[in-house]
Curated annotation (Swiss-Prot):
The lineage of its organism: Bacteria, Pseudomonadati, Pseudomonadota, Gammaproteobacteria, Alteromonadales. The keyword Cytoplasm applies. It comes from Shewanella pealeana (strain ATCC 700345 / ANG-SQ1). GO terms for molecular function: 16S rRNA (guanine(1207)-N(2))-methyltransferase activity; nucleic acid binding. It catalyses: guanosine(1207) in 16S rRNA + S-adenosyl-L-methionine = N(2)-methylguanosine(1207) in 16S rRNA + S-adenosyl-L-homocysteine + H(+). It is found in: Cytoplasm. This is Ribosomal RNA small subunit methyltransferase C.
Amino acid sequence: MLTNASQVLLRNSDLVKDQSVLVLNYESDHLPKELLATASSVCGLALDYHHHLMMQPYAAANLTLHFGHQLPTDECFDTVIVYFPKAKALAPYLFNLAAKHLKPQGQLIVAGENKGGIKSLPKQLPSYFDKAFKVDNARHCILFTSELNSPAPELKLKDWLSRYQLDTPQGQVTICNLVGVFSEKKLDEGTQLLLANLPKMSGNVLDFGCGAGVITAALLKAQPDLKLECVDINAMALASCELTLEANGFTAKVFASDGLAQTSQRYDGIISNPPFHDGLASTTNIATNFVKDSANNLKAGGLFHIVANRHLPYSDTIAEHFGSVNVLAENNKYKIYSNVK
């Protein structure tokens, strides 16, 4: 099943007839493969690891697939398709990345949902692109095209980075935040409660949904001998976490994982401010699987320590997989669940 934006792209696939195409920030479907019916070759760069895993089985000589915040080569394409990102701050980065990989006068195609901010695209396109032209408006989405009219500035990661000092209960740490990664430049309420009620951890610890590495940095500030692994599904988050570790002189293993599927060991501790907050049925299922997988990936005596919105139904699942529920602390918004396996 194609997303709405992908359906609009596919019905305009004559725009890429016999062309080499790069698809940036593709969604949870098989659109890159579908484009091969008209395009001569397709390369996809996913910023979401789950999206990458969905497409990976279809990789072929004319369909190359990558996960990350940049491509591993400087290859240039006839057309670059950009899915307008849900995090609007990421859009200028993607346009710069698109320009880097476009041939002179190459075609830019941008598709996105009306409610996601795509309507303002003509004002957002940088000057090295021509004025955006609206080609289609369907499925609550808009499709724009443009053309590269001059070379773009060199893409330097430091130009897209926010770096700031953060006070935590464990001490002050430096946080490096790339565009599109959640940040308030201060401790969000949930993480504040989590770190204010941090038990002493030991051995191998997993920071699930690490984001820019706030929890990891605080942990290592207090306990530099911990062996930490940091996982996230988002390429910009993983790059941010690596930069945060470097800025503080800390060491941890950072890698992409869809849930806990790509982890390969059992842990002495799992800590998280999990990125499931909206209470939708799909979110609840993901949260349930996270608790179950955490129990399966903890050693006997291992600690499961998370913060969650108090309205999310964690208690029953934790009781099922850990035998009991221990709420270590709570306020009017959040609960700290801290359970030993």
